[in-house]
């Protein structure tokens, strides 16, 4: 959505027209149910940071989510974006809301591809932890997973360690999990809307192919990159078919997808929560930390921490034009 009507003009009492103020940024405020922060307070904080607030407006949300959040946008002009961003992030953390500061260039960018991590991004669990629980080694694997996602362990080494603990698990546990996946709020609204806008949607996951393929079938993803568990005689061997889909692999896959579609990576967005998502998020034209680990939030200027996946649509310029689901 281009930032049209960037303040316009106003008339003084003697009919002189005030100077036009050009909007440099958009502030997106997403307030989940249970939180309380008025848009006027955000405007006050922006003004205290030296920004001029040109316009504020409410944005419709999908009908299915209308009782779960409110969304506002503020057009602003700011010369000190670093100071403004810091104040807005502090406000976000204090009130448990999502506030994104985006440049005019980012708002005007036409995005063609959206790539998503899967575990704890599209679904509300870590698949390897769920399978470990079924194998009776849940606590042990969950701790290793948490450390790996925080970037405290080498991903490949920790992944092999966790996989080895799954050895002997009945392969039916994977399909059983696929049948009861807990998906993130707003997933269907987001995928339907982005698909209706002609975007290519992809899952790049360090998780497992059967789970990713189930999401692909249910929600219309076009591409899937994930790990293939090695199965022998109906049992998990504790290994995957190489290569492991890790941090570097995801970034390479993003570049390859963009090249195949004949677009630059600046026309891609990447959404993730863990340390193994950071490279693809940094490479993309828009990287979004979604319900992310602290290190990922710290490295990402744009985040959605308290609301659902429909928040991605507001960052892409949606004014409530959500596709029917």
Where are these regions (language model features)?
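Active-site neighborhood of HAD-like aspartate-dependent phosphohydrolases
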Residues: 39-42, 106-118, 122-153
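Long, compositionally biased regulatory regions of eukaryotic proteins
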Residues: 2-3, 296
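Non-catalytic pre-domain segments flanking phosphatase-related domains
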Residues: 2, 10-116, 324
């Amino acid at each position: 959505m281009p930032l049209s009507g960037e303040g316009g003009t106003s008339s003084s009492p003697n009919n002189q027209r005030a100077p036009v103020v050009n909007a440099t940024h958009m502030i997106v405020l997403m307030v989940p149910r249970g939180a309380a922060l008025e848009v006027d307070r955000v405007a006050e904080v922006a003004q205290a940071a030296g920004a001029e607030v040109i316009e504020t407006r409410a944005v419709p949300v999908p009908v299915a989510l209308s009782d779960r959040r409110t969304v506002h946008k503020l057009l602003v002009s700011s010369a000190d974006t670093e100071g403004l961003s810091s104040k807005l992030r502090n406000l976000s953390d204090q009130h448990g809301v999502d506030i994104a500061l985006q440049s005019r260039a980012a708002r005007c960018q036409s995005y063609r591809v959206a790539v998503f991590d899967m575990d704890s991004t599209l679904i509300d669990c870590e698949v390897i932890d769920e399978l470990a629980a079924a194998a009776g080694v849940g606590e042990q694997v969950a701790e290793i997973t948490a450390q790996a996602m925080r970037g405290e362990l080498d991903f490949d080494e920790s992944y092999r360690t966790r996989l080895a603990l799954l050895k002997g698990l009945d392969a039916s546990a994977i399909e059983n999990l696929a049948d009861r996946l807990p998906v993130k709020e707003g997933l269907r609204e987001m995928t339907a809307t982005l698909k209706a806008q002609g975007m290519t949607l992809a899952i790049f996951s360090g998780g497992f192919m059967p789970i990713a393929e189930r999401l692909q079938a249910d929600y219309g993803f076009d591409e899937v990159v994930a790990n293939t568990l090695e199965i022998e005689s109906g049992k998990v061997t504790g290994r995957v078919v190489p290569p492991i889909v890790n941090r570097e692999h995801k970034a390479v896959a993003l570049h390859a997808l963009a090249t195949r579609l004949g677009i630059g990576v600046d026309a891609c967005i990447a959404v993730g929560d863990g340390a193994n998502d950071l490279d693809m998020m940094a490479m993309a034209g828009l990287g979004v930390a979604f319900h992310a680990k602290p290190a990922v939030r710290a490295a990402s200027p744009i985040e959605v921490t308290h609301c659902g996946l429909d928040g991605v649509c507001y960052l892409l310029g949606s004014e409530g034009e959500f596709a029917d689901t």
